[in-house]
Amino acid sequence: MWPLWPLAALLALSQALPFEQKAFWDFTLDDGLPMLNDEEASGAETTSGIPDLDSLPPTYSAMCPFGCHCHLRVVQCSDLGLKAVPKEISPDTTLLDLQNNDISELRKDDFKGLQHLYALVLVNNKISKIHEKAFSPLRKLQKLYISKNHLVEIPPNLPSSLVELRIHDNRIRKVPKGVFSGLRNMNCIEMGGNPLENSGFEPGAFDGLKLNYLRISEAKLTGIPKDLPETLNELHLDHNKIQAIELEDLLRYSKLYRLGLGHNQIRMIENGSLSFLPTLRELHLDNNKLSRVPAGLPDLKLLQVVYLHTNNITKVGVNDFCPVGFGVKRAYYNGISLFNNPVPYWEVQPATFRCVTDRLAIQFGNYKK
């Protein structure tokens, strides 16, 4: 069993980058560029960290569900084979960990009295039913982790205080209009690993959201959704079935600085489609079916990282990455991956990478037919 005293501190420092669901400790780790903190990203006036413990009532140390570990307003009831949310949870609890159990339903009064709860972890249960008022008492909830369950829809009536929702690896096929209504503080949603198709997003499904981060990876998308929040800084659509990027696919997403499209079936990127991303810094197009370097990369003045490995690229032109002349690009590349492409790297002119910080930033070779 993990010691409990560091959990609250770690959760307060967590970054909203849920690339992969792991153990509880890994909820707090970040394997990429740092995100804006909750307050900066959402524009909310409320603080983004754990509530000031001095402002809360004293800890009711005698109240701890059987088999659980309770300390410093953290209640850890993971890996106990629980069939339901336990009773006798202290009302001053700020973090409730119920992952890796056999809970199948969240009932109306399961969280009654937990008005100070900041984070709720329900990962890897068997939840298929949630009462429409189950989350009503959680007026201060900011982080809800309910991945790896049996949900077929987004839970109704999510708390308006919510900042981060992780609901990947469920059975959700539809995102209806209004399901996120009133969630003005939300800045991060991880909903990959659901059998979502493009038609599953109703028009206006994300209306009102000012998201900073969205991941819909490992789904069934055949194109880039055109009605996502225009506030996005990060969009991850890797491991889908996207075949092309058309001219206006990215028109709405001018604030992106990281775009993940790896492990798709992209053969064509229409000329000019990348010009709508003036702040882009990192572009993942690895493991696709591209036959050439996408047009428009030299015009992205802030672009620093491009993943193009494992495609069908046979030629790299001298102006494919860098603009003509000096002083045009505001940030030099520090990573270009071209390995596992049928391009004869010995034929590539050295001037091709004149705007790269270091030759070690370029990855070539290792192509096998």
UniProtKB/Swiss-Prot annotation:
Record SUPFAM superfamilies: L domain-like
Predominant location: secreted
Entry GO MF terms: cytokine binding; extracellular matrix binding; glycosaminoglycan binding
Disulphide-bonded residues: C64-C70, C68-C77, C322-C355
Post-translational modification: The two attached glycosaminoglycan chains can be either chondroitin sulfate or dermatan sulfate.
Tissue occurrence: Found in several connective tissues, especially in articular cartilages.
InterPro entries cross-referenced by the UniProt entry: Leu-rich_rpt (IPR001611), Leu-rich_rpt_typical-subtyp (IPR003591), LRR_dom_sf (IPR032675), LRRNT (IPR000372), SLRP (IPR050333), SLRP_I_decor/aspor/byglycan (IPR016352)
Biological function: May be involved in collagen fiber assembly.
Name listed for the protein in its UniProt record: Biglycan
Source organism per UniProt: Bos taurus
Organism ancestry: Eukaryota, Metazoa, Chordata, Craniata, Vertebrata
